[in-house]
């Protein structure tokens, strides 16, 4: 079933990669619970859900971009797909994880080192601001694939956007901070 996705698009219902990532994560948790409860039926259902979720996630892979896209049937990149690395869907040592991260950087990384959620037009036009949660996901993904020095550098950059009491806003304009 299609949905509005993490970013709650008002006029765009798709099969979002992020949604299926959480189906996959939920299936892993359900498998663990089934083992503890010795519930074979639950275990089989969890495995079925996990297999279906993996299938849907893989349909989001864009061979041309060497990364996972926002949804099935589109090549649009979405920073929420950084979570494929952070949640260990992708093996962090794999070429695919590293290529996916590079694709994300190429498409969504701003000149100030922060990250856009996505770059395509939405209900309000083309995005003008980066989202700080995406920058934190980026830092985590860098650390996961072993790019620790860069992770520290970008984390320090993000902290620089806090106000006098250490609070961060949801978004930051790339041009004027």
Predicted regions and their residues:
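Extended glycan-interaction surfaces of carbohydrate-active proteins
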Residues: 1-10, 51-132, 153-177
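Inter-helical turn/loop segments and adjacent helix faces that build the functional surface
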Residues: 2-10, 29-48
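Alpha-helix capping and helix-loop boundary segments enriched in small/acidic/polar residues
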Residues: 7-21, 41-44, 72, 126
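Aromatic- and histidine-enriched alpha-helix N-cap/loop-to-helix transition segments
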Residues: 14-25, 75-79, 129-136
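Hydrophobic, well-ordered secondary-structure segments
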Residues: 20, 24-27, 47, 54
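Well-ordered alpha-helical scaffold segments within catalytic/enzyme domains
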Residues: 22-39, 83-93, 136-150
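Secondary-structure transition/capping residues
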Residues: 34, 41-44, 64, 68, ...
């Amino acid at each position: 079933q299609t949905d509005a996705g993490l970013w709650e698009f008002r006029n765009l219902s798709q099969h979002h990669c992020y949604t299926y990532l959480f189906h996959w994560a939920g299936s892993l948790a359900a498998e663990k619970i089934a083992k503890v409860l010795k519930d074979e039926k639950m275990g089989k259902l969890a495995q079925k859900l996990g297999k279906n979720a993996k299938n849907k996630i893989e349909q989001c892979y864009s061979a041309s971009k060497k990364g996972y896209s926002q949804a099935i049937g589109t090549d649009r990149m979405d920073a929420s797909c950084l979570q494929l690395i952070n949640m260990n869907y992708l093996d962090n040592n794999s070429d695919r994880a590293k290529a996916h991260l590079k694709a994300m950087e190429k498409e969504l990384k701003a000149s100030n080192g922060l990250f856009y959620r996505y770059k395509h037009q939405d209900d309000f036009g083309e995005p003008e601001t980066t989202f700080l949660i995406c920058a934190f996901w980026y830092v985590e993904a860098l650390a996961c694939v072993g790019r620790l020095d860069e992770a520290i550098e970008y984390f320090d950059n993000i902290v620089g956007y806090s106000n006098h009491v250490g609070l961060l806003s949801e978004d930051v304009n790339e041009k004027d901070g």
